[in-house]
Amino acid sequence: ISAAAALAAPTLALAQARPIRLVVPYAPGGPIDVTARLMAERVKDSLGTVIIDNKPGGGGNIGADIVAKAAPDGLTIGIAAVATHAINPWLFSKMPYDAAKDFAPITQMLRVPNVLVMNADTATRLKINTLQDLIAYAKANPARLNYGSGGNGSAGHLAGEMFKRDAGIFAVHIPYNGGNPAQLALLSGQ
């Protein structure tokens, strides 16, 4: 965060007169959104007001494209992620931006791990207590399990597909419009 503040110093006078728009290409409430909000609060004394603008959709492409096409005045910055800059160029035949040329990096804010979790009530009902139990259940009950992710092509989606391949199981992928909606569906037993 300190590095982000230092790199943004040339726009400090302008940023204090007008707010900085921080585009988050994912749904509100997810880990990247929460991190962006914490960062905005942390830098407000040195950079002025930072407004979070969530623009989910297209695996992050909608928000990233807004940043790519913004005026280069330092007042619009964005969160880049694995999906927007490493995965999507391989998934989409026509990208609205060039991930390598249309952005200038500021700093790495965080690393987000992929975690495999299951609704506790469902796990109890199916007698799944370990990863081995989950794999055994999936093999004995093909196509009975679903898994959710923050969207098609997201890191969670690709991690789920790799897990299925490596475990030799099948589960139906349910893409959500962001990690937070996927988490809410999980907690509610969907």
Regions found by a protein language model. Name each.
Residues 27-29, 82, 111, 120-128, ...:
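Short coil/turn segments
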Residues 36, 134, 160:
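Aromatic/hydrophobic pocket-lining residues that form π-stacking "cages" and hydrophobic walls in ligand
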